[in-house]
Amino acid sequence: MNDYLDVTELSGDDVSSEQVLRCSHRYFWAGHYCKDKDVVEVACGTGPGLGFLLRQAKSLEAGDISEPILNIARKYYGNRLPLKKFDACKMPFTDNSKDVIIIFEAIYYLPDIDKFIDECTRVLRPDGEILIATANKDLPEFNPSPYSHNYYGIIELKEIFQSRNYDTQFYG
């Protein structure tokens, strides 16, 4: 199995100011939806926004499929929040237990988006929300990850989620 270390931003990596701004904006945006809610971040990677979300949410759990990446997050966060290894399509949470599920820059790694949506539907409480940030495949400078399964455009995501009775909103 791929550990995604070669495509994950790690502490000490060179990153552009644009990358930092995009990451910050995603989590500040998510913070509004997570305020005093039970939240899980799926595919959390090294956890760049978990500290902020921890201060916003009533409860926060996070996980990733890559144990080496989770170990990096565990070194930083220690016992401040539960970090678990899990597959986004088989989450270790009880039915109707979360208000918000976050998946940032990882939906394209999922081999089956329908299984992911089924799992979100199981885990989310009624009126729960899924927050997604993803690459825009329609931009000229788009650079796909070598491990991706499928990049979705806005129209595709809208159709997929609305066919499953989710209301959708998109921000550019």
Where are these regions (language model features)?
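Conserved N-terminal segment of class I S-adenosyl-L-methionine
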Residues: 1-90, 117
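A short beta-strand submotif of the Rossmann-like class I SAM-dependent methyltransferase core
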Residues: 100-106
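A short acidic, Gly/Pro-enriched loop at the edge of an enzyme's catalytic core
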Residues: 89-100
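Conserved beta-strand signature within the Rossmann-like core of class I S-adenosyl-L-methionine
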Residues: 128-134
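A short glycine-rich, Lys/Arg-flanked "PGG" loop and its adjoining helix->strand segment in the class I
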Residues: 114-126
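Short N-terminal helix/helix-N-cap motif within the alpha/beta-hydrolase-1
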Residues: 111-115, 142
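Conserved S-adenosyl-L-methionine
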Residues: 166-172
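Acceptor-substrate binding/catalytic loop of class I
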Residues: 141-160
